[in-house]
Structures are given as C-alpha cells and as structure tokens.
Amino acid sequence: MVQTGLEDFPSILYNVVYNDDRKEFNAQKGGFMNFFIVDCFAEEKYQGNELLVLKADRQISDEEQQKIAREINFSETTFILSDKQENGGYDVRIWTPNVGEVPFAGHPTLGTAHVIRNCYEGGGSETVKLNLEVGQIPVAVTEDGMTMSQNPPEFGSVVQRKEIAVVFGIGEDSIDEKYPVQWVSTGLEAVVIPLKSRKALAEIKMNRPAFERYIERHPENYCNHLFFVDMGENMLAARCMMEDFIEDPATGSANGDLAGYLLEHDYFRSQDVQYTVIQGEDMGRKSVLHIHASQNNGDWVIEVGGNCYIVAQGEWE
C-alpha cells in the first residue's frame, strides 16, 4: 500500500490512499467524510466513467452537496446518507456539477453499490439496494460484475432526423430511417438515435447554438442523446452526448433506455436479448456495458451491468 500525503496541495482532497486490497475501509469519525473514486463500466482501472462516492457521516446540506459535485467536476457525484439499510436499502443522492440533483443515473448507481458492498458490508452481499429519488434500485453481483435493474420503459415523442443531423453535425442519411429517433426513459430520459455506420458515430460534433434552438422547440429533449450502431455479433457501439455539452464515457441509464427501445422496435427480432455495448472509445475512456432485456405481455426486464474499480480513497474535509 502506498499513501500519498497532499497536505501542501491547495485542495480539500488529501491523504489519498491507493490500495489494491479494499475489502475493509475503517470509517473515520469527526468532521471528515470518507470518499472513494471509482471507475465504472471499466475493464481495467483508468477506463470507464469516473465517479466520486462520499459517505456522509455528518449532516450535509443540499448546497454543500452541489458544491462538492462542482469541485470534483465528474459527470456525477453520489452521497451515501444512511449507515445501514433503511426501508430495505441505502439512502443515496446523485448530483451533477451543472444540472443539480438527478433522480437516477446508471454508473453512479453501480459504483455506489460497489463501494457499499466491498467497503461497508465486507464483500459478502449478493444484492445491494439503493433508495434513490426514482425509487428503490437493486444491484446484484453477477458474472458481469455488478448488474442493476431499471424501470420499465416509457416512450415519448419522435424527432425528425434532419433536426438531429443539424444539431450533431452528421448527415441526415447517416441516421437509420428504419427506426425512429425517440425519447425513452427507464428512470432517466434519453433521446435514442440509430446510426448506419461506425464512421458516422465518430463524426458526431455537438453544435451549441443549434442545440439551444432545438431545445426551444422540444424542451422535453433537454436530456442525454444516445447514438448507437450495430457492430454485429451482439455488440453495439455507442456515444452519449449530455445536455451540458459534454460527452459521457459510460451511461447506464441511457443504455437502459436503449434496451427498452430495441425491444419496442424489435431491433434484434427477439423479445429476450443479451448484448454488449462499447462506449467512450472516441474519448479515450473505453467502457463495456453488458445488457439483458426482455418483454413478455408488458412485463419488462431491463438489466445493465459492468465492472467497477476503486482507484483511490481518502478523507474529504
């Protein structure tokens, strides 16, 4: 174990511990909170989507939670608010640096459950349940790492391909006309866009003025926009452009939306599918998401899984 003291560094992050054996982490008392930096949906450390998880061992206001999320500036930061399970799960809140609190998000759910299981429950739990604003979300230990169950999908409005082409700098003919561009939510909404080629996926570039005009026309679409292309052999490539003009390297919530979309439009010609999504390659943070989805007479199963790695832990003042 190597411990790095950062006392002279002008930051509220210090005494960061890099440790490959994290089965136990002793909670510190007093005014400090334990924090963990987690790479989610990653095949190894320094890939996937970064997450800051804090264990709130003291009262912490909404204002302070928002300030911490802005300080670390990851796409999301989570706060574990209960020392033990309350109503069958752990109370958790999810914050973004710019949008504020969100009711649900995929990689924060997975990463927070990973921290609870390995650092506070001793690594023995088969399921960790999180009480989120959207409701209780179970996260299970599976052969794919950690797997969360998402809500049944809701389907909203359809968007014209030419509008998406203008906003994201791609040709209208690169969007697959066989399937709609559609708003979907399994807990946190996204607009799902089917593409014809990996080349088109790589060419996406968000046009801020065009996006702002687009949102004026479609305020319900102020959300993630998930682009995907079929790579064959039960594998999709995807990119997710967020509403604050940032690309997300791994988006569990939007991939749950995508799973519902694929079943609704019979994309794989099956109502019980398993496939893998590769996201984040174009930004150097390769992420791997394992999806299982099924639908039978209105009974939906949406499961999104992947591996998580704790890369740092320490105290937050």
Where are each of the predicted segments found?
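Extreme N-terminal basic, low-complexity initiation segments
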Residues: 2-7
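Active-site proximal loop and beta-alpha junction motif in alpha/beta enzyme cores
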Residues: 15, 29-104, 110-317
